[in-house]
Amino acid sequence: MHEMSLCEGIRGIVEDQARRHGFSRVTRMRLEIGRFAGVEKAALSFAFDVVMRGSPAEGAVLEMIDLPGRAMCFDCAEQVELDDRLSPCPLCGGGRLMPETGDEMRIRDMEVI
C-alpha cells in the first residue's frame, strides 16, 4: 500500500510547515489527486488517519479533490480529457496521445490554527 508512504511524505511537509510558520494544528487538508495517480482513496484516508497520529494534522479533515486526466492527441491536434490512460481520443478515435495531466498529487491547502 503506497498510500502509507504518501502520507508519511505529507506528514513531513506538515511538520516542516508547522516549524516554519508557527502553527500548532491542521484542522483541514485538501489534496488534489489526478485520475491516473494510482491512489486508492479509501486506503489514503485510512493511512492519513494512522500516519498523522501525534502530528499537527492528527484529527484533521481530509478532503480529496479529483483532477481529470488530459492528453494531447497528435491525430486531431486537440487536448482531450480521458477516463483511462489507455483510452483512445474521444474526439477522433486516434491512439497517438501524450498524457499531460492526471498523474499528480499535491496539497492544495491546509487550514491551520
Swiss-Prot record:
GO terms under biological process: protein maturation; protein modification process
Molecular functions (GO terms): nickel cation binding; zinc ion binding
Domain of life: Bacteria
Residues engaged in binding Ni(2+): 2
Keywords in alphabetical order: Metal-binding, Nickel, Zinc
Binding residues for Zn(2+): 73, 76, 89, 92
Region forming the signal peptide: none
Functional description taken from the UniProt entry: Involved in the maturation of [NiFe] hydrogenases. Required for nickel insertion into the metal center of the hydrogenase.
Alphabetical list of NCBIfam families matching this protein: hypA (TIGR00100)
Similarity comment: family membership: Belongs to the HypA/HybF family.
Name of the protein described by the UniProt record: Hydrogenase maturation factor HypA
